[in-house]
A protein has these predicted regions:
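Acidic/polar loop patches that form or flank catalytic/metal-binding clefts of enzymes
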Residues: 18-22, 79-84, 139-143
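A glycine-rich dinucleotide-binding beta-alpha-beta segment and adjacent secondary-structure elements
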Residues: 2-57, 85-95, 240-293, 298
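Mobile "lid/hinge" segments at catalytic clefts and subdomain interfaces of large enzymes
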Residues: 94, 102, 106-134, 139-143
């Protein structure tokens, strides 16, 4: 509102009749395109080689705009980057914009993601470093550190899964942690899954009975020695991250496995591509609303079609039959 109007509004409030405005309020307005006219690489569907990123796509600024710039930049430079909804919040952001559009500046919130247990802050490098390396964004030395970290996490989890602790070894620690005592041997991974225990509580007990040697890089969760091919020790911050990752992956294994299964089902739908030039009016059985939405939005695959408002499970079944008949 104009400054004089703002002043009039404030002075109409009891007690503020003589107030002075130090700095008037303002609103930010900007033009934007219809993001549903972009594909998942942020390229215009009807103009090859034209990419859009940022607030012009209907998102808010800052992180949302920067994330789109990263994807559009890689793809416009000739690389290939496509992050799906189960791989990163960037994937959720872009998929929502190009599939559903938006009536107000889009903010990326965790509640928008179906696979939040997979999209954790602690595993961002495990999810995305491989994609970044293939896109040319990750240098070889950093990528090698990542692969070593990944190998050590997997090796440590395998090692701990083979260790069984007897009551006489574990019960003193369990009593100190007010955890139920053992009457027979228990896998160390099962102990880590107890709510009152974690990796650091039980790791000191492991070497006393372990016949499985620690990995070359990683020793007992606290020490590191040179790995294969005379590589230098892993930095301390990576060792700390390894411990955290081992603890999380063991403790929440059941929940993580459930979400991985759900994500696998989601990806099956994503891999069923819909040809760009389908005439939806010719597909018998589709409801009128579905035909109109599909014709306008032109989803790239069956998964994207399933997230369009107005496309029902019955419509998806008809599309699936159509694809199989082609």
């Amino acid at each position: 509102m104009p400054e004089d109007v703002q002043e009039e509004v404030y002075r109409s409030i009891q007690g503020l009749e003589n107030c002075e405005i130090m700095r008037p309020a303002y609103a930010i307005e900007y033009d934007c395109i219809d993001p549903t006219q972009l594909n998942l690489q942020l390229e215009a569907k009807h103009i090859q080689g034209l990419y859009f990123a940022g607030q012009i796509n209907g998102s808010s600024g800052y992180e949302e705009a920067a994330a789109q710039g990263l994807v559009a930049g890689v793809n416009s430079a000739g690389g290939t980057m496509n992050i799906d909804r189960a791989e990163g919040y960037i994937g959720v952001l872009i998929d929502d914009l190009v599939t559903k559009g938006t009536n107000e500046p889009y903010r990326m919130m965790t509640s928008r993601a179906e696979y939040r247990l997979l999209l954790r802050q602690d595993n961002a490098d495990l999810r995305l470093t491989e994609k970044g390396y293939k896109a040319g964004l990750i240098k070889p030395d950093r990528y090698r550190l990542f692969t070593r970290k990944q190998e050590v996490i997997e090796a440590e989890i395998r090692r701990l899964a083979k260790i069984t602790l007897s009551p006489d070894i574990a019960n003193k620690m369990l009593a100190e942690k007010f955890s139920a005592l053992l009457s027979s041997g228990s896998k160390i991974t099962d102990l880590i899954k107890r709510p009152e225990l974690n990796y650091w509580d039980v790791i000191a007990l492991a070497p006393k009975q372990s016949e499985e040697p620690p990995s070359a890089d990683y020793v007992q969760g606290v020490g590191v020695q040179a790995g294969a091919h005379d590589e230098p020790p892993l930095p301390e911050y990576i060792r700390d991250a390894i411990e955290e990752q081992v603890n999380i992956q063991i403790k929440y294994e059941g929940y993580i496995s459930m979400q991985l299964t759900q994500a696998a089902s989601f990806r099956k739908m994503e891999h069923k591509a819909l040809p760009a030039h389908i005439d939806y009016d010719e597909i018998k059985g589709l409801r009128i609303e579905a035909r109109q939405k599909l014709s306008k939005l032109r989803p790239a695959n069956l998964g994207q079609a399933s997230r369009i408002t107005g496309v029902s499970p019955a419509d998806l079944s008809i599309l699936l039959v159509y694809l199989k008949a082609r």
